[in-house]
Design a protein with these regions (language model features):
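Short coil/turn segments at secondary-structure junctions
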Residues: 3-7, 40, 86-94, 130-133
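A structural signal for well-ordered alpha-helical segments within the folded catalytic domains
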Residues: 17, 21, 47, 54, ...
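Structural signal for well-ordered, non-membrane alpha-helices
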Residues: 20-28, 57-61, 103-114, 147-150, ...
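Conserved alpha-helical segments that form or flank metal/cofactor-binding pockets of metalloenzymes
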Residues: 47-79
Length: 220
């Protein structure tokens, strides 16, 4: 793990805490019936999305806490099976319970960031996928989760409202992923995609928008 960019961490934390507040404001207005209704993600209700965001925050907290001790922690100690069980366990809770648990997990994670020292930010942790990542990347990864899933909730928040910081950083990552997954000579995005506004191009890339003349994007 290299030396973290503390100013970039600051910007990601600022953007993520704002996204957290929007998520909580939206969640506070949802009824039990709203949470049972489908989200834009196949097979997931809105309750599944919120419960995933709750579990995701707790997992990131575990990574940060372990890094603060100089250890490499697991986001989901039981792996992807634990992650998937955790999403189901609580997705059907009453709205007040689910949102209270979401709020608690958000402030648990933010508290880890606000108390974080050099040891924590220099550390690394293991995602549910098994990939090892710098803890300094966690605020950005959480920003991505909250931003995209706010759209997935199907409550009227489109990609047009995604924060500029997220769009800029994720476009860079998606372009690198595209280049790495295509053979020589096909490493550039399709010309039609390059004609799109940045936010729509990103929404297409992560499969949150369909565009005439383009196949479905590769997704996250």
């Amino acid at each position: 793990v290299g030396t973290p960019d503390l100013r970039l961490i600051d910007r990601c934390v600022e953007a993520c805490t704002a996204a957290h507040q929007r998520l909580l404001a939206v969640s506070d207005g949802l009824t039990d019936a709203d949470l049972r209704a489908p989200s834009l993600l196949p097979g997931w209700s809105r309750g599944h999305v919120l419960n995933h965001l709750r579990r995701n925050a707790h997992g990131f907290s575990l990574m940060c806490e372990a890094a603060g001790r100089g250890e490499e922690g697991l986001q989901y100690p039981g792996g992807m099976d634990e992650r998937n069980r955790g999403i189901e366990d609580g997705a059907d809770d009453p709205a007040p319970t689910l949102v209270a648990n979401l709020r608690a997990s958000i402030y648990e994670l933010e508290a880890k960031w606000f108390r974080g020292d050099g040891t924590m930010w220099m550390g690394s942790g293991v995602l549910g996928t098994g990939a090892t990542v710098p803890v300094s990347d966690v605020p950005y990864r959480r920003l991505r989760e909250v931003t995209v899933h706010l759209t997935d909730l199907d409550v009227g928040i489109s990609h047009e409202e995604w924060p500029d910081l997220f769009v800029r950083m994720e476009l860079d990552r998606q372009k690198m992923a595209w280049a790495a997954s295509h053979p020589m000579g096909l490493t550039q995005l399709p010309a039609r995609a390059m004609e799109l506004p940045d936010k729509l191009r990103l929404a297409w890339l992560i499969n949150r928008a369909r565009v005439d003349g383009l196949p479905d994007g590769p997704g996250l």
